[in-house]
Structure formats: structure tokens, C-alpha cells
Amino acid sequence: WTRADIQRRASAALARAAANGVTHLRSHVDWFTADAPDAWQEIARLDTVGITLERVALVPLPLFREPAQAETIARAVANSGERCLLGGFIHSSNWDAAAMENLLCSAARWDLDLDLHIDEELSEVSQGLTWLADHLSRHPFPGHICCSHGCALAAGSDEQAAPILRQLAAHGVTLIALPMTNLLLQDATFGRTPRQRGITLLHEAQAAGVATLLGCDNVQDAFCPAGSYDPLDTLACGLFSAQLSDLFDQQSRLICDRAALTGSPADAAPFAVGATASVVIFPGSDRFIWPLNSAARLVVNHGRLTHRRVWQEEMAHES
């Protein structure tokens, strides 16, 4: 991809997200070496159209194997400005406990929050979350940690998952499920219908006190040719794939809990008297059918109406 191509694609993505009512978006940027890729700088130059945009350096775990290189990567992220996080792609195919140790230590030294792409597999022997839970019990992390995917939790037993979830809750770790991507890619074999859903343990995590969110990890890329930048699509997918209930009153937090994403107490109360409002109004919906049949909307960002999507008329014709 060229820089111009990155600009075009990313700008279109931000415009679509803003029109859907997104005000805070976090993007994983693939790093293939210890040096920042072109996309890292190009995304920083984007007009974010009123969206708070965070960049995560998604680095394959083996690149943290050498402590000096781990420091180089963490320093580069820390020197990239505000709203940058250190991340890692952690899978049984690249597992390295020493690299995990270096990843967490370098993030702590450079005062970076972590966003870990971890255990995206249906393997009972994946070690990412198991190792992290054990490590945190002995070495608390000073910043905030998000763990996305965590599909492997659904492949093991409840007895295996329970102590992991207790440790994640105790250390304020947020667990993010990606229902569209997980349904598409997990238990996938060409010509065979999948048997497993591949969604992490949302209900069990919530019961254990773990902060939970839903996200959309891939939109029209090499891993997922479809998708959208509409959080309501993600929530609707989660409704069916994870059998969620109380969508409007309770589980709507899965797509709008900024504090769960950032770990910042300042984000815990987005509505305050005198503050500028950032809300999405669904004029053709109600709490019983939402998030389905809710495409029409009014987007108010920081007190200003920025987008309006309405149905002018719905016609019924007799045959």
C-alpha cells in the first residue's frame, strides 16, 4: 500500500464511523519490524472528523524477545505523541514467555497502556491469558490493559477460566470480544460448516466483575471482507452470537463504555450538567427493537448536530 492509499482508506473509515455516531475509535496498526510502519505516521496525520483516535502498535510477540529491541519499540510508541498504546499479537504459534515479560516491563517503563491481541484461537493450551493472569498476581501493572479476542477461554473448561477471570477483574483488565471477526474466522475450514462460535466468555467475565466491551477488529480487510464502522451492527451480532439480554438497559454499555476502554476514572461519567452533549438519537426506534431497525439517527458531537440519517418514506404496494 502507498501512503496515499492509506490516507484514502483510513479517511473513508473515519467518515463512516463519524456518521454512525462514533466519537472514540482505537485502531490496531500492524508493525512488522522494530521500526514504525508508514501507516503509523499516516494515521497520525488524518483529519479525525471529531473522533478521538487512538493508535495501537500491534507488534508480533517475537519482536519483544530481545530486551533492547523491546525498549526500542516502546520508546518509539511513547515518543509518538498522545493517544498511543503498546500492543502485541500473542498466539500459541509465537508464544514466548520471556517476550511477554519484556513487553510488559517496557510498557511500564515508558508509561504506556497496553492493548493485547491475545489468544485468538480455539486452543485449550494457549498460554497468553493464563500467563498474564499469573504475572499480574505477582507483578501488578501500573497502567491499563485491554485484552481483545480471548477466544481460547471458550475452548477450555469453566474451571480453567474462572481463576483467569478473577485475576483480570482484580487488576482492572478489560476483555473485548470481536463477534463479527470471531464468528467468521474461528473453527473455519473450507467447505465445512463451523461448529463453534469462537466468542470469548462474556457472561462469565461480567459475572466475575471483568469490564467487557464489544469491538469490530476487521472491516473490509484481508481477514474480513465485510463489516462496518457501526457499533450497532457489532452489538446486534453480539446479541445473537453471545445470546445477550437486556440490550438497551444493560448491554448497550458494551459499545459505549469509554472508561472500560481507557481505564480512566475521568471517562466513567460522560454526562454532567453543563458539559457539551455527545449523543446519538434514534428517532425511528425504541428500547424493544433497538439495535435492530435503527439505521436512522441523529448524531450530536460535543453539542453540535454533525450527521442526520432519516428515512423519508416507507412505501407499501399491493401486488
Regions found by a protein language model. Name each.
Residues 37-55, 111-116, 205:
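Alpha-helix-loop-beta-strand connector modules within alpha/beta enzyme cores
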Residues 21, 86, 117, 147, ...:
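Divalent metal-coordination and catalytic microenvironments
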Residues 134-144, 196-282:
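His/Asp/Glu-enriched, well-ordered alpha-helical/loop segment
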Residues 23-24, 84, 211:
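Short acidic/polar active-site loop segments enriched in Thr and Asp
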